[in-house]
Every structure is written in C-alpha cells, then in structure tokens.
Amino acid sequence: MGTALVYHEDMTATRLLWDDPECEIERPERLTAALDRLRQRGLEQRCLRLSAREASEEELGLVHSPEYVSLVRETQVLGKEELQALSGQFDAIYFHPSTFHCARLAAGAGLQLVDAVLTGAVQNGLALVRPPGHHGQRAAANGFCVFNNVAIAAAHAKQKHGLHRILVVDWDVHHGQGIQYLFEDDPSVLYFSWHRYEHGRFWPFLRESDADAVGRGQGLGFTVNLPWNQVGMGNADYVAAFLHLLLPLAFEFDPELVLVSAGFDSAIGDPEGQMQATPECFAHLTQLLQVLAGGRVCAVLEGGYHLESLAESVCMTVQTLLGDPAPPLSGPMAPCQSALESIQSARAAQAPHWKSLQQQDVTAVPMSPSSHSPEGRPPPLLPGGPVCKAAASAPSSLLDQPCLCPAPSVRTAVALTTPDITLVLPPDVIQQEASALREETEAWARPHESLAREEALTALGKLLYLLDGMLDGQVNSGIAATPASAAAATLDVAVRRGLSHGAQRLLCVALGQLDRPPDLAHDGRSLWLNIRGKEAAALSMFHVSTPLPVMTGGFLSCILGLVLPLAYGFQPDLVLVALGPGHGLQGPHAALLAAMLRGLAGGRVLALLEENSTPQLAGILARVLNGEAPPSLGPSSVASPEDVQALMYLRGQLEPQWKMLQCHPHLVA
C-alpha cells in the first residue's frame, strides 16, 4: 500500500532568537538535512508525499488544556523580550512568533499520518516535524516540545478510529515523560521508552524515569521504562532490549497500531545521547516493529542533533518502511553489562503484569556501584568525565561511509516445480522458470539417491538457479519447492552450494524431518537450528535442536528468546529456512518466522518448501519476504511448561558462547 512522508516547509520557520546554549541545537537544519538526504537517496520519490496540515485547537485539546493552548497561541504577537521571558518559565524551551503555527503543523502531520494508515491509504509512514513533542505535557512546554505530537496522534486514533490497543515506542535518548504522564493510567496505550538516565543524573532528572515506574491504576504495567545508566550503548544493546523486553510485551499486547517517537539523538555521534548505535540499527528496529499491528507503523520525528547521523538514521528508517531489507549491523553483537542490568531490572519490574515474562527468570539484579540521584536536582555529568569519553571517541568512519548496499533488481522470486494457477503473488514477485545447467545439476545431485528421480532433479535445477541469483546479488530473497522425499537432500545441496559460492556465514533454520548432514564441516561458517527436533539439545555451538513449541506463546518465546538472538549473534550473510516433511507450522507462524529472519543477511533469505506445503505457504511467504507484514497470530497464549523448560535449558547451555542470548548480567565475563 505504500509509505507516506508527511512534511511542510513552514516547520523550518521557528528558531532561537537569543543566545541559549541549551536550546541552540534545536534548529531548522534538522529538517532540511533529513529531507535533503531522503531526496539524494531517491527515497522521497518512492513515498506518498503529504503536506502537513495544522491540527485544530479541538484536536490539540485531546491532550492539552485550553489555557495552555491559548498561551501558546498568544506567542504569535509577542516581541523578542516577551518571548524570552515566557520561555524562561519552562525547562529547555524557546518560543518564536511562528512557534504556534509550526507546532500545530507538527501535531497535524502526526494526525494526517495516522489517518492515512488507518484508512488504508498507506501501510506506514514518517512525519518529519519540528518542534518535537514527547516532552510536552498537558499544560506545559518542555525540552524543545510544545504540543505532544505522538500523544495527540494516539488520542486521535482512539477517538476517531476506535482503536483499543496502541503501542508507543520512544527510542529517543531522552525520557518522553510527557507521553508517560498523559497515559500512565490508560491500559489502551502501552508506552515503551529507553533513555539515557545515569541513575537520575541526566535530564530530565526524574525519579519516574526509572524501571520501577510502570504506570498507575488501571494502567499498571502499561508504562515500560528502560533507563540506560551508561553512555556508549550500541547496536547489540538496542537489539537485545527489543528481543528480551519490548517484543515479548508487544506480542502479548497485540497492538492495532504502532506509533514511534523517532528520536535519533540515540544514534552515534549525537552530542545529547553519546551513544554508539549506527544508523543501520534503526532499520533493524523498524523492521522488528513492522511484524506488529499488521505493519501499521507511524514514525514521528523527535530529537536528533548531529545532522549527519540524523539524516542517515532517517534514511534507514524510511527505506525499511518502504520494504527494503535492513543492511547488516556492524560491531560485536554482545550487550554490555550495564545494558543487561537495565534490561533485567525492567523485566523484573514488568513481570507481575505480563504473562510472557512470568515464566522466565526475571529476578531483579543490583545495579553497578554508582552515585544514585539524591533528593532534588542532581549534578549533571561533566562532558570531560571518564564516563563520557568513550562515546565522545565514537568512530566517525561509521558515519563517513554509510552502508549503501545496491538493491538487487529482483526483490523476491518464486521457483516452483509445477505452475500453480491458484497462487496469488504480489505484482513485483517473479515466478522463475529457468534452471541451472543439466550437467551441473546432475553433479550436485549425484551423492544423493533421492535426487535421482526426474521430478527431484528438476526442482534442484530451479533451486540452484535461484540460489545463484541471490549469491550474485541479482535476487534478494526467494522461495523454492522440492518433493518431500528429496527435501533433506535438496537442503544439503543448498547449504553446500551456498558455502562454496560466496556465503561466508550461512544460517539454516530447519523445521521437520531435516537433520544436519553429519559430514558438514564444523568450521563455524554454518549455524544449524533444527526446530521440531526430538529433544532440546545444544549438540555444538553451531548445531542446536529444539522441539517445536505446541502453543503460540511458546513459539514466540522460541523465536524471540532463541532463534533471533542466535541469528543476530551469528550475523549470517545467507539464511535458509527449510520447511520439510512434518514441519507442523501454520501459515501465520511460518510468515512471522520468515519476516523476522528477513532482518538478517540484508534480507537474503531462501525458503525451501516441501511440495505438500507449497500451495498454502508459498503465497504468504512471498508476501512477507517481499516486505509485507505477516498476519497476526491472534490472542496471546502462554508457553507450555515443557516449552519453557526446553528454552531455559538451551539458553543455559549456549549463553556463554552466544552473548545475544543473555538478558541477565551475572553471565557477562
């Protein structure tokens, strides 16, 4: 359905009119730099461009008091000295004669985006706005924010569109206390915020930014705070937070809409955040969110003050919303001790309210020794202090050379053994008819008796041709079919062909009667995960087997708690998903697995289906590999005790080697 980009050039008008070192970083170039980069990359042209409208005062009143709206309206006629005096009554705020107009446009852009997504005009989108909004409170401007754009959008989605479950993900580096205050007693809005906290020593210096602030009244458990107590958090820390905290709760909540307070001051190079996450990380975060709410994701710009980092991160977010695969992540995939402490503390605080966490080890852990915030306003961290120096020395090369992988000419191809006239594919998914050379196909088939039959040989030839197209960069992802009797042999050939023709690290996720070939080299180049094995077993660091969970909750726990952490730790450049005889997966479960694995290997995922599964699975897998959202799994269910036991056993065996499995700090060396 497409991606919307909502913007209005008038939002560059508001600016600081006096000297204020605290506020000078919020400047018009934040918008123009991001928009210019989108145009340079050809991304704006691929979006449905919407010109932002002003929010009405009635719409602003969904979250703000009439008196506050009136106060901001009156700034249009104030002089410089009066504006400065009024600004001084708030924390980290400046007003300009155009602020009221710009802030109404910013709020209106979020409303337009929500309307476009919820009416089906587009699938998702980004609103490029300023001033930002997530610190804005019912009767107060705060932290560069005038009207709370995302909160207004959430209230509008409830009132106008009748939504009952809205997820707000705030990945800005500052705590969006404005959103928290507005919805802390509302169970229809699940608010997640990670933020630089430093045990209360970082702005906005609030006790209620800590992990144990979980909402109140009926909203208990619907506020999720993840406080970062050190600077320098990187890609592994952010992905671990999603896998071990946000996504388990989000799947249980089952949102109808995802709103993102998309602040990019949490990216590398930003002077406010001093974090290490590269722009590509936001592509992965976006893609992980797109498996929720039928892909209805609305991102609204918040912070971001390093123009290069901001522009790159915006581009990564938009190209992922457009359905492009996420580029590979850089750096070691091992969360740091401080991140694990914060994640586990948040899990422990949330466990009483969420079934998905109650079956796991979520005991609270003591924080690393530090000076916790005293009563009153604590002293800020000094920029030259030892805690800040690591982030200040962030490698600029990560921004100087952004990951610009050329897109394959074909996003998704399907190679079936026989044409299926009932198969409905997206218009840009091609049905491949070509095959590898007969002599080459026979050579690969020769060691396998099950590949001697003509039907199996034909299927193998089509698979080899498709796989070569993926390895050569002509095709991004694909689906191939094979006779059930030849499924194991065909998978064996696919693995060996991939490793011998360019893949350096191959991840194979095999379901059903598909055992790892005993003579496959144990050289660390392949990671084999067998789901539907006879028992949970870590046969080696690179060979893991687990039974297929019987409940949807167990399946989600397996994907989020085992498969994806292993996959992100391994960082493959080719993923094979094989559904063999007796695989036991229903269409929505297979689609979710493929959609979430698509975040790996630059989206280079090949799904191998045994023929009996092809009619019901080929279409749905083609859609998710092509960038569409998977269907909902329906109402959440808990994992069975047997599934929980298998998962905990495997995590215990594998955590020392695979750091992304960890969500408890005592395991860090």
UniProtKB/Swiss-Prot annotation:
Localization annotation: Cytoplasm; Nucleus
One GO MF term: zinc ion binding
Modified residues (Phosphoserine): 393
Binding-site residues for substrate, renumbered to this chain: 20, 305
Main location: cytoplasm
Motif Substrate specificity in this chain: 21-24
Species this protein is from: Homo sapiens (Human)
Residue segments, region Disordered: 361-387
Site (Substrate specificity): 272
Annotated protein name in UniProt: Polyamine deacetylase HDAC10
Domain of life: Eukaryota
Annotated gene: HDAC10
SUPFAM superfamilies reported for this sequence: Arginase/deacetylase
